[in-house]
Amino acid sequence: MFSENIGNDYIVIQEGTSEGTQVKYKKDGYWYKKDNRGNEGRAEYLVSKFMQFTTLQENEFISYEEGTINGKSGCRSKNFLDEEEELVTFYRLYYNEVGKDLSKVIANMNTMEERIEYVIRFIDQSCGLNIHAYLSKVLTLDMICLNEDRHLNNLALIMRGNDFYCLLYTSPSPRDGA
């Protein structure tokens, strides 16, 4: 377990999800997230430990440590992005490309299958990336871990130059809202 005191100058983002807002920091090669409701950090740590015992490769997910941040429970992960990489959420990619809110667009579709296929088709057309396997892994993990907070701001691609690739990670943190 770690214990870290971090000043407000390291705060990266304070964005809400349907489960609430959590303070996120980036310092010395780590991303930190303080618990908001209690035990979110422990959940992320346990899920990342669980993933070590699956058939996933180490480069497909983020490992978390649990600890304390400014005396409050939370978690941290090593920064998973290289200098020339950027995390782009599905929401932001769609907004940048189309100028509309992807969640509102798919909310008007009749079935979940239509919504998923629309997103898959958009990512393929925009990035040349087939995300079927990625979504299958993320949604399977969500089902196993009872994650009910999956949305378009915590599904993301890593962009390096003009290339995109997927990384399975355990939860919205610390990239939520990126």
Feature map (PLM): residue ranges:
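ATP-dependent phospho-/nucleotidyl transfer catalytic cores
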Residues: 80-139
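Short, charged/polar micro-motifs that form catalytic or ligand-binding hotspots
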Residues: 34-41, 130, 134, 141, ...
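Single conserved hydrophobic/aromatic residue that forms the stacking wall/gate
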Residues: 169-178
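Conserved ATP-binding subdomain of kinase catalytic cores across diverse folds
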Residues: 1-99
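Hydrophobic, aromatic-enriched interface-forming segments
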Residues: 135-168
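Short, well-structured alpha-helical interface segments that form or flank functional binding sites
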Residues: 42, 46, 130, 150-152, ...
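Active-site catalytic microenvironments for nucleophilic, acid-base chemistry
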Residues: 50-54, 158, 173
